[in-house]
Amino acid sequence: MTTWAALIRWAALRPQDLEDKKVFVQAGSGGVGTFAIQLLRHWGAKVATTCSKENHNLVQELGAEITIDYRKEEFSDLLEGYDLVFDCLGDFGGVDSVTKCLNILKANATSHYISLNHAFIRTIDEKGLLLGLPAALKLRYQVKKSAKPINFHWSLYRPSSSGLSELGRMVRAEIIKPVIDSIYPLENIKEAHEKIATSHARGKVVIEVKKE
């Protein structure tokens, strides 16, 4: 639903808008990235992504045509003329990372940059409202002052019954196959959060509330 909300709700894109479009998914082997690659590929997009070398086979199986080892290669040196950046790393990568994402986009009004990590939420979380708000505003200014004339979106999760229904259909039809990194019982939720915090989960981290 995170991917659906970002593309459909915030960027106001339709599946047909992505046919044959060049899309870059930053951090494609995580819980959201593995889902985004499959959905975008199903809608006809040509997907490039970053991940560790160990996860290249995974993202290729999901539909990525170009895989970049972020530890050894700089995606901004390899990619250009993209229509959409779906940035799962977002502002956690800092101004430099976001700027590189913007630089690979076509400079026109049909290009989109979507970040899943809102600068306001992160900086206020880290520094509190008093210090976090000015820091977020500064970050936003630094990024947007060098941005091309594109559509810039900071996405937040928003529920959608129609979206959930359609995604459920895709999963049942095996168009989208959820990638599970690990499953934790509810009493081990702290360990699950610690796993997510490493930013090295391979797919989704699942909390098992009740085992039948």
Give the positions of each predicted feature.
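Terminal helix/beta-alpha structural elements that buttress the NAD(P)+-binding lobe
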Residues: 1-212
